[in-house]
Structures are given as structure tokens and as C-alpha cells.
Amino acid sequence: MSGLVRLGVILTDRGSKYAVSGAAVASRAEIDSVLNDLKSDKTYAKATHNTWAATLPTGALKADDGESGAGMVILRMIERAELQNHVIIVTRWYGGKKLGGDRFRRVQDATRAYLDHIGVQS
């Protein structure tokens, strides 16, 4: 078990649904374990994008999973909040309409919801 916290679907925009999850991690192997745990749920495995970012003692990591630039949005928010040894995953199920730049605002909204949930100032 990875200690994964799932907030589920927290917002929708023009048919797209966004969820946010996260966990404390100390290594890339633990990030992979958290991602595998999340994707063991078929709903998340079938998502259009599972973008994520993490801070580790060895440095920061991120992945866009096809949602270009989204990992960096999450990473900037994690770094601004000074959250260490943590991964945050923003999941999107595409709703059929392109969101343009609003997709980054939705990623920010989801990340902020997670940070608020764990009691970290964003």
C-alpha cells in the first residue's frame, strides 16, 4: 500500500472531469508504486491524463502524460508551497471540448484542493 490519498473528481469544465490524488514519497520507486496503486482502479487507468509532479531529496520530477505543460504547473505549486517528499497527481478525463489555457487553471485548482486537504498553504 502506498499511502495514496484520493480526493476523487473535484471539478468539471466543459465535460472534462478532474480528480486529484497524492502521497508522501521518498524515491522514484515509491512514485511508481503510488502511480500503480492509482491506476489499479480501472477508472483512473482509463483516464485521458494522469499528470504528476514530485519533490524528492534528489530533486524534482514531473510527467505530463500527454497534457503538455501540466506537470510543470503542479511542480511549481509544490515548490511554492515548500512541500517536500510528496507526489501530486492530477487526473483528467477528456470531455470532448478543448479547454485551451483554461486546462492549466483546472490543474492549478485541483492541485490547490489537494494542498488545502493536507493542510499546506498554497
Predicted regions span which residues?
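Functionally constrained cores in energy, signaling, and assembly domains
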Residues: G22, H86, K98
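Active-site-proximal loop/helix of nucleotide/amide-processing enzymes and allied scaffolds
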Residues: G69-G71, V90-S122
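C-terminal regulatory domains involved in ligand/effector binding and gene-expression control
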Residues: M1-S68, I78, D116-V120
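Short glycine/proline-enriched loop/turn "hinge" motifs that connect secondary-structure elements
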Residues: M77-L83
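Glycine- and acidic-rich phosphate- and metal-coordinating loops
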Residues: A54, N85-Y94
